[in-house]
């Protein structure tokens, strides 16, 4: 009942999407998912996740959500998977304690097949800056699955770049060895974000042998693409990139 209800909601949302076919084609190029894409934009998906969570019609519990994800069929669309992930952290789920949210996130990461399904569920939130989420993020870094590693890296970037843990983040980033493109791009993104508030520390790390040539180049590139650096720092980054 819940599955068919959610699919019905997704179909309705897809029909209301303007320029749907163009959006589907665009999404197909960048999402790199094997699943069908309905063509629903993120704001609408987030809105739908909240509506389903609040709906008396669905009354989705943690057990229901766990079952939905564990029984994820190959014919479920991309947006269906992402919707499950978004519902994990809906504010209306006040009965979901920290351990439950982490457990559900672990299950969700078993069914994702796109970087966007990972990045879209990670938010900067003090509820996710606890020791339990820190430990979970570190656990993800050593996983064999590319998207799980990406989740760990992006989680550290979103919630743990502070004075207390910055050196620990750098130390842990050195241990990431996954060769997948999206795992390595997450590392480059991490360093570029880190450089905003910890510029000298990050530049020193990027210049060291602790960072691969590929990640280093991409990190410099992402820094130069950002508008968060002063002209002086951009010049310094460009100089490091050329050396």
Describe each region flagged by the PLM.
Residues 1-243:
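Alpha-helical scaffold domains
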């Amino acid at each position: 009942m819940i599955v068919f209800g959610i699919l019905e909601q997704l179909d309705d949302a897809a029909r209301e999407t303007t320029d749907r076919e163009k959006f589907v084609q665009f999404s197909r190029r960048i999402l790199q998912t094997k699943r069908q894409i309905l063509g629903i934009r993120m704001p609408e998906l987030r809105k739908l996740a909240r509506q389903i969570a609040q709906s008396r019609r669905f009354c989705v519990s943690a057990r229901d959500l766990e079952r939905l994800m564990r029984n994820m069929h190959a014919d479920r669309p991309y947006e269906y998977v992402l919707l499950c992930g978004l519902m994990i952290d809906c504010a209306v789920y006040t009965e979901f304690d920290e351990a439950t949210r982490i457990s559900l996130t672990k299950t969700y990461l078993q069914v994702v097949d796109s970087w966007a399904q990972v990045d879209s569920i990670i938010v900067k939130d003090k509820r996710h800056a606890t020791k339990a989420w820190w430990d979970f993020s570190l656990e993800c870094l050593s996983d064999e699955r590319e998207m799980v590693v990406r989740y760990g890296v992006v989680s550290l970037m979103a919630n743990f770049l502070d004075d207390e843990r910055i050196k620990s983040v750098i130390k842990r980033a050195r241990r990431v060895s996954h060769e997948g493109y999206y795992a390595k791009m997450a590392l480059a993104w991490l360093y570029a974000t880190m450089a905003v508030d910890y510029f000298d520390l990050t530049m020193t790390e990027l210049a060291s042998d602790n960072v691969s040539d590929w990640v280093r180049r991409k990190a410099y590139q992402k820094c130069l693409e950002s508008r968060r650096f002063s002209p002086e720092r951009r010049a310094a980054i460009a100089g490091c990139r050329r050396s």
